[in-house]
């Protein structure tokens, strides 16, 4: 067993090339094989770009209300306590609802790959604001 101290967690603003709007990320690192672990705060209306993960992703909504969408499907509303499973290489996005903050924990497995996210184009306002 190892404990990774919260004092070693780096907080940084989410990069503009990955997000629309303002986000803050707490990045925890664990030795490989392992996973990427991120706590992300999305301000109202903020969201990721479309993206994929080679080994999928798990989101746990800590607080607030958000939105998530798989390419070709309807926008879904996500709430405090919800867990979202995203399959490997599934094109998707996620973020806060238009009028509320949302915080989630993102777990990106990296057992057979480097776990790198493939960041794609921004989510249009039309896609983001589609009825959830």
Model-based region annotation:
Residues 30, 52, 60, 78-80, ...:
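Conserved strand-loop elements at the edges of beta-sheets that form or border functional pockets
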Residues 1-35, 116-132:
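A short, N-terminal "cap"/entry segment at the start of jelly-roll beta-barrel domains
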Residues 48-50, 68-69, 91-98:
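Short beta-strand His + acidic residue motifs that chelate non-heme Fe in jelly-roll/DSBH
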Residues 72-88:
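Short acidic-glycine-tyrosine-enriched beta hairpin
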Residues 58, 85, 99-119:
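A short hydrophobic beta-strand segment most commonly corresponding to one strand
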Residues 41-43, 52-68, 107-110:
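Short, conserved beta-strand element in jelly-roll/cupin
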Residues 36-53, 88:
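Conserved short histidine dyad/triad with adjacent acidic residue
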């Amino acid at each position: 067993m190892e404990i990774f101290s919260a004092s070693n967690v780096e907080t940084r603003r989410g990069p503009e090339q990955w997000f629309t709007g303002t986000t803050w990320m707490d990045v925890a690192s664990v030795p490989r094989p392992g996973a990427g672990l991120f706590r992300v705060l999305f301000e109202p209306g903020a969201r990721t770009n479309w993206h994929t993960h080679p080994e999928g992703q798990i989101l746990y909504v800590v607080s607030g209300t958000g939105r998530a969408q798989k390419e070709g499907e309807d926008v879904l509303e996500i709430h405090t306590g919800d867990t979202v499973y995203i399959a490997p290489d599934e094109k998707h996005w996620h973020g806060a609802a238009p009028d509320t903050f949302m915080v989630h924990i993102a777990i990106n497995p990296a057992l057979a790959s480097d776990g790198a996210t493939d960041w794609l184009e921004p989510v249009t306002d039309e896609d983001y604001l589609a009825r959830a």
